[in-house]
Amino acid sequence: MAMSLKKIGAIAVGGAMVASALASGVMAATTSGDVAGFMKNAIKEDGTPNVDIVVGSGAAVMDVVSAADVAAKIGSMAYKTGVVEDRSAVVKVSAKAESDDVNIFTLNATNEDIALVAAADSDYAKGFINGSDQLKVTDQLASGSIQDVNDADFNATSLGDVSTMLKVPDIDPSDWYSNDDDAGEVVFTRIVYDSDKLSIDEDQILYASIAYKNDEDVFNDNNTVTLKPGMRIPFLGEEYAVVKIDDEDDIIYLGKEAKDGVLKEGEXFAVGNGYEVKIASILKSGDTSTEYSVNVQILKDGKVVKEKTDTVGGSSSAQLKLAYKDVGVVVNDAWEDIAGTTGYAEVLITKDTKALELGEEYIPDWEAYAALNNSDKLEIKKDITESDKANIIGIALKYVGDKKKKLGDRDEVDIANYLKLVFDDEDKNDVLKVKFLMDESKEVTLDIGQKATVLNAEVRLKDILADAQQSVKLTAPIAKLDSEVSLDTADKNLILVGGPVVNALTKELVDAGKVAIDNTSPATLAVVEGAANGNDVLVVAGGDREATREAAKALLEMI
């Protein structure tokens, strides 16, 4: 079955971008030609790709995954210099990607309303649609919002993934809760017919970041994870840690990791901008207790501006949570050395800490909400209680701006300054296609050796050059279908993923006797010089899709 391969455009900067995890025990591939030399030239000096990746129109899912992995890995070969400030740098990361599209006229010829969903992972999007083609949202959310869940004629449609929306593959990297769960971004919109014109009203666009159990993607009670302090989730393309969920003031605090580790009693950690966090004291509660009374201070320019003492550890696994302006602190555990003379605290300290005031506008026209799982359906709330905290599985932003009227060709609807919903009639009378689009840039400040996850790329600052001042935009190569590329007109080097059965360009090379691959071939990496309009070609293939996957893994190991 032919597959539609969307453009892959995440930009990896400054060191290493984590692509799909590779299985252990990678097999060696049969090589022909200078594979290492080919890959050395995959990125130009200006940071732009010198290669297109081509997958067959009839490719299996495994071939598509291999192409995506190779694209991401090539992006990680580039380096980015930022604005130097002491031993840190401001690094700009950009990304462009789009979802599948749908022709509204074909989807709803009878002028019925439609609901669209896309996500960081296409399975998350599909997992939000039930067997009756309805979104899994509560009546409370649906009332005047995403859709009427009781309307059997109301069809919801998945537009798959926007590959640069962020998915966090491990929300508990410090193993505070001994899990390896995931979290991903999802976006919903409802388009209604209003006097035969398309419109989007207030409350009819929703962005959400939701925590799922490991390898689960269907939204239901069994598959989502309750948010707890220290967990990492995506928020508008960047990875944040949960600092505190405050049910008294209806605020969820999120921050970017500054330190995740252990501080000794009396030790201070410099967060930046004059702020420090100090573990002022750690006192044991009794001779046999595992509970400790911990005092934490936040200092600004050497003066204490916020202080808290609370119980940590014990049978209840109590935590200390504290937030002040840009700084957040979670103390997860505490203990003493064997002599009982020095205390230690396991801490998460965050910078750029944000207070999401529920029911208030986080940015103009977008209100913040807690996202809950209510009997297999998504619910959003602005007034949360202590009992609600057990069901909070994410955060959400809801559109509360003016109605978008008479939507048509070339119209764009902004989604939280992060995504867009775009319309295109392709110059045809019976066509109006709609899709989600991202064309976004973000800046992140990193110390040497520090990493951050932003726009679905993991960025690590390897080093700072003395003259590192110039900003260079780096772009990962774009994956294309074999129907979009010709060996006769190619303007750059090509990587062909898949053998002659699934990739038409590979078949051309085989038929011309330039590469030898058939259905019995092992994992193969073969460079054919000058075969693409004077440009070189690297074939990544094997006798079947498993062999092709092994060839791709072998290539990634070589880079």
UniProtKB/Swiss-Prot annotation:
One GO term (biological process): cell wall organization
Signal peptide: 1-28
GO cellular component, one term: extracellular region
InterPro entries reported in the protein's UniProt record: S_layer_C, S_layer_central, S_layer_MJ
Glycosylation sites: N108, N130, N155, N222, N373
Location of this chain's protein in the cell: Secreted, Cell wall, S-layer
Segments passing through the bilayer: none
Keywords noted in UniProt: Cell wall, Cell wall biogenesis/degradation, Glycoprotein, S-layer, Secreted, Signal
Pfam families per the UniProt record, alphabetical: S_layer_C, S_layer_N
Family, similarity comment: Belongs to the Mj S-layer protein family.
Main function: S-layer protein. The S-layer is a paracrystalline mono-layered assembly of proteins which coat the surface of the cell.
Name this polypeptide is given: S-layer protein
Gene name per UniProt: slmt1
